[in-house]
Regions:
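Acyl-donor (CoA/ACP) binding surface of acyl/acetyltransferases
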Residues: 1-56, 86-186
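Conserved GNAT-fold acetyl-CoA-binding loop/helix
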Residues: 52-73, 84-85
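A generic secondary-structure signal
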Residues: 73-77, 139
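Short loop/turn motifs at secondary-structure junctions and domain boundaries
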Residues: 77-83
Length: 186
């Protein structure tokens, strides 16, 4: 992000956040993506414990209370500071929280913006990661005017590598990070 324009849409997102109302990021045929709110944390905590996505190198904390404290600070600061973050993914038909996906500044990628997605185990294999990924890519381009995004995936995570490929990401490099061999896509 080289320059930053304050437009009416930005001001409306800022107003909603300061009023404690989660900003709706995107809506697809089957999914709603919106900013995470405190009441989402218990459901998300259960999904995070299942594994599958590293939240910007922050491990899942030991207790729900610790996670709640961490996430409430994240909610108060990240969305306001960056105008993006990791968002709650809701299956519209059931109203269930099925995962979390979004954009974050990755210390592992020298502060480049990274796309991440985690769908709960019982909802995997239904195309939800790809569906919310496409919505996030459109939001990143149309709303945030981001010119470059990355995904960082463990080389053994074939499912996530496949999703990234379907989203148009291609191999960029390989690295060893925290002892895990990774493939970086851009």
């Amino acid at each position: 992000m080289e320059e930053f324009d304050i437009d009416p849409a930005f001001l409306e997102r800022d107003r909603l956040r300061k009023s404690g109302i989660p900003v709706k990021i995107a809506e697809t045929e089957r999914l709603l993506l919106r900013e995470t709110i405190s009441s989402d944390i218990p459901d998300l905590y259960e999904i995070w414990k299942q594994g599958g996505m590293v939240r910007g190198t922050v491990p899942v904390l030991d207790t729900l209370d610790e996670e709640t404290e961490f996430m409430e600070a994240y909610i108060r600061h990240a969305y306001l500071f960056y105008d993006f973050g990791l968002w709650t993914v809701i299956e519209k038909q059931s109203g269930q929280i099925i995962g979390q996906a979004g954009l974050f500044v990755s210390e592992l990628l020298d502060d480049a913006v990274e796309l991440g997605y985690l769908i709960g185990q019982s909802y995997r294999g239904k195309g939800y990661a790809q569906e919310c990924g496409r919505a996030i890519l459109a939001y990143a381009e149309e709303v945030l005017d981001l010119e470059e995004l990355h995904v960082l995936i463990e080389r053994t995570n074939d499912t996530s590598l496949h999703v990234a490929q379907k989203l148009g990401f291609g191999p960029y490099g390989q690295d060893q990070i925290h002892g895990a061999e990774t493939a970086e896509d851009t």
